[in-house]
Structure formats: structure tokens, C-alpha cells
Amino acid sequence: MQAVRNAGSRFLRSWTWPQTAGRVVARTPAGTICTGARQLQDAAAKQKVEQNAAPSHTKFSIYPPIPGEESSLRWAGKKFEEIPIAHIKASHNNTQIQVVSASNEPLAFASCGTEGFRNAKKGTGIAAQTAGIAAAARAKQKGVIHIRVVVKGLGPGRLSAMHGLIMGGLEVISITDNTPIPHNGCRPRKARKL
């Protein structure tokens, strides 16, 4: 134990910053490093007293609960599993948003095509944001305040659709990415020649 103290003291005395012009920055004696068994016992006793003095409380987590696990978090009196889900399917050509209840009953649907965008304009971020605002307005008419968002696909409207839901007045509780990723599955189609 004494060798460790001396080695630590030597290291602290020899260490300097590059721009200190030969000045020693950290010079501490080896005695200040707490390694004694008595100090460890005192620290453990102090920690035990603090734990006993602290009021007992339930475990709190800001993360969504694991399926089957009970959570103390509530949104407007509803559990996490009871909050409606907004499914966003963002392809390269279109973005579709469907809001369903916790029991998977459809509440609202909107896509870039139903909002008046045609052809290549359906695949833009503005169209996805407009569809998000429309889906949020229809869901609010059914009494939805909080939603969970599940995003599927890598299209240009995936983030814009979420912003549209927020702009429409819905409060997003969680965002889940459910994009399918093949683990060397089917052979992909040939690359486009532009």
C-alpha cells in the first residue's frame, strides 16, 4: 500500500501542463490520498446514515416502460400502454400517417395525396408536414391529446410528419423507429441508371 502512495505522489509531482513555463501545477503529498481502512469504514457508515435518513420513494424513470412492466408515469390519467399511436410510413414517393387507439382502432388518417399533393410533390417534406397537421386535427376531434409515434421508412417526410403532428396540437410522448432492415434477406432490385 505504501508503494502505491509513493508512486502516486511521484506521478502528481512530475505532471505539468505544457504552457506552464516549468511551473509545477499539481504538487500534493501522498498523505492526502485516502486509502486507509478507517476512512473507508467512516465513509460507508456515513452513506448508510444518509440512506436511512432519505425518504423512501418509488423508482422513477423517464424512459418508456418495458412491455409487461408497470410504470408510475401518467399522461392525462392514462398509462403508457393506453396512449394512442401515430404510425408514420415515410416512403420516397409519399408519407402516410394513421392515428390508432391503444386497442388498434383507427382514429384518423392522412397522407400527402389526400391533402392535395400530386405526383413528385407527395415525396416532399412540406407535403408530409401538411399531412401531419391534418392528421393531428382529425385526431384532436376524437379527443386525442397525447400520442406515441412509430416511424417506418427512410423517406424525406419522416421528420416533417412528426413536426406536423406537434404543430397540430398533439403532445408526443415517445418516438419509435420501426424501419425494417434486412439481415441479408432478399436480393435488392437493381440500381437506377440516371
UniProtKB/Swiss-Prot annotation:
Q: What is its main location?
A: mitochondrion
GO process terms (BP): mitochondrial translation; translation
Keywords carried by this UniProt record:
Mitochondrion, Ribonucleoprotein, Ribosomal protein, Transit peptide
Task: Give the quaternary structure.
Answer: Component of the mitochondrial small ribosomal subunit (mt-SSU). Mature mammalian 55S mitochondrial ribosomes consist of a small (28S) and a large (39S) subunit. The 28S small subunit contains a 12S ribosomal RNA (12S mt-rRNA) and 30 different proteins. The 39S large subunit contains a 16S rRNA (16S mt-rRNA), a copy of mitochondrial valine transfer RNA (mt-tRNA(Val)), which plays an integral structural role, and 52 different proteins.
> Which molecular-function annotations from GO does this UniProt entry contain?
RNA binding; structural constituent of ribosome
Q: Which HAMAP family match?
A: Ribosomal_uS11 (MF_01310)
What PROSITE patterns does the database record attribute to this sequence?
A: RIBOSOMAL_S11 (PS00054)
Family named by the database record: Belongs to the universal ribosomal protein uS11 family.
What domain of life is recorded for the organism?
A: Eukaryota
Q: Which gene encodes it?
A: MRPS11
Annotated localization: Mitochondrion
| Gene3D superfamilies reported in the protein's UniProt record | Ribosomal protein S11
Q: What is this protein called?
A: Small ribosomal subunit protein uS11m
Provenance organism: Homo sapiens (Human)
A GO cellular component annotated for this chain's UniProt record is:
mitochondrial small ribosomal subunit
